[in-house]
A protein has these predicted regions:
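Conserved CoA-thioester-binding segment of acyl-CoA-metabolizing enzymes
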Residues: 1-54, 90, 188
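Terminal low-complexity tails and localization/encapsulation signals of metabolic enzymes
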Residues: 1-2, 246-259
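Terminal peptide-recognition signature
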Residues: 16, 20, 34-35, 53, ...
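Generic structural signal for alpha-helix termini and adjacent loop/cap motifs
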Residues: 21, 45, 73, 95, ...
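Hydrophobic alpha-helical membrane-association signature
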Residues: 31-34, 84, 114, 187, ...
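Glycine- (often His-adjacent) and acidic-residue-rich active-site loop
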Residues: 55-91, 107, 135-137, 220
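Crotonase-fold acyl-CoA enzyme core
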Residues: 90-206, 230, 234-238, 242-246, ...
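Short, charged, surface-exposed hinge/linker loops at domain edges
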Residues: 210-219
């Protein structure tokens, strides 16, 4: 079904592995389309509790747009963003399930944007992020201008975007670009720990949190108070909420089913 990525679902985890190692997992039009389709499939699959996004190999998560593959396209850059990149980023931000990025290597250009669109980024210490758009006379896209200032503030966002410099793991964690940085040898274990947590978490509650937090970025207090009330009312009717409350009263660990 997929030619440019590997999609697997096991034990509540949907794993998307970008699989174009010969070009450092660069984003061709076909790969972008497949990522969007895979995220949509994970959203529709009730057995999926958490989504993992990573790249094949140990050198690159994603090196950004495949410029050679795009040369044969008649589509303008703006149309390419509107019809391909933007739907991919929107799918990641709106799936009502947590998205974990295993940042195993370089994440450059739109590859950096792709990583920043995830809910949790676990990064190898020797990997790096770079918004290298400026190096070819372009501005950051694929959501980077939205995510970056909200993560690190406007002044630092401008510095990173206007220089395109590399931000390695330790600095990325220090300035808030990523949530966790570990040694390369510990990356898989750290990722699996995080996946284990989320696949046993109350999935619908996590999805409601994600939706509310997304909306809070461009909303006001009154709107968010109403959003919280509506969300809590719906969650109060779920099986997971019933299980969570009962487990609390019985002083035991809850057994969530994602329902």
């Amino acid at each position: 079904m997929y030619q440019n990525l590997i999609y697997e679902v096991t034990a509540g985890v949907a794993r998307i592995t970008l699989n174009r190692p010969q070009v450092h997992n660069a984003l061709s039009p076909a790969l972008i389309r497949e990522i969007t389709e895979a995220v949509t499939a994970a959203a529709a699959d009730a057995s999926v509790r958490v989504l993992l996004l990573t790249g094949t190999g140990d050198k690159a998560f994603c090196s950004g747009a495949d410029l050679k593959a795009g040369l044969g396209e008649a589509t303008s850059m703006g149309d390419a963003l509107r019809t391909r990149y933007n739907p991919m980023i929107t799918a990641l931000r709106t799936i009502p399930k947590p998205v974990v990025c295993r940042l195993n290597g370089l994440a450059a250009g739109a590859g950096c944007s792709l990583a920043l669109a995830c809910d949790v980024i676990i990064m190898a210490a020797d990997a790096y992020l770079s918004l290298l758009f400026v190096g070819i006379g372009l501005m950051p896209d694929a959501g980077a201008t939205f995510f970056l200032p909200r993560l690190v503030g406007s002044a630092r966002a401008f510095e990173l975007a206007s220089t395109g410099r590399r931000v390695y793991g330790p600095e990325a964690a220090q300035i808030g670009l990523v949530q966790r940085v570990v040694a390369t040898t510990e990356l898989d274990a750290a990722v699996e720990d995080t996946l284990t947590y989320y696949r046993h978490a109350p999935t619908r509650a996590i999805g409601a949190m994600k939706q509310a937090l997304n909306r809070s970025l461009y909303s006001d207090l009154e709107t968010m108070l109403n959003q919280e009330a509506d969300g809590q009312e719906a969650l109060g009717e779920t099986l997971d909420a019933g299980e969570g409350i009962m487990a609390f009263l019985q002083k035991r660990k809850p057994d969530y089913e994602g329902r």
